A protein has these predicted regions:
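C-terminal auxiliary extensions adjacent to catalytic cores
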Residues: 1-129
Length: 129
């Protein structure tokens, strides 16, 4: 899982660059007659990319932490609010010790995050007190 963590670290570094304010890169237009050039479209595209990167980072963290718990620390009991998440992940991802490409599992978990299935599952299976 070292490669997965390297990927997550790379995505975090990319987010550092993407969160540089877009307004700093404003460009003069109309022969210098326009005082204001909206950088909103570029800022919006960068924001969407950051959101996608964060989903991938969370997917990697969920995959690696759940795999390690399931394969090496069972029967370590997770926190009550974490248990529903692990239960949902087990329905969609096969956890095994062998080497395998992780892309498919990361994509599955990313989709569970993107579609709010993890959040809905936790809300349904965990009662806040």
């Amino acid at each position: 899982f070292m490669t997965a963590h390297i990927t997550a670290a790379s995505l975090v570094s990319e987010n550092k660059v993407l969160t540089h304010p877009a307004s700093v890169d404003t460009i003069s237009t109309s022969g210098g007659q326009e005082d204001f050039v909206s950088m909103a479209p570029w800022a919006g595209r960068k924001c969407l990319r950051v959101i996608d990167n964060v989903r991938n980072i969370l997917a990697i963290e969920l995959l690696t932490s759940t795999t390690i718990n399931e394969l090496f620390h069972a029967p370590l009991k997770m926190a009550r609010c974490t248990q529903p998440v692990i239960k949902l992940l087990k329905k969609h991802v096969h956890f095994s010790k062998g080497d395998r490409p992780l892309h498919t599992d990361i994509k599955i978990i990313n989709d569970l995050i993107k579609t709010n299935r993890i959040l809905s599952w936790v809300n349904k299976n965990y009662e806040l007190k």
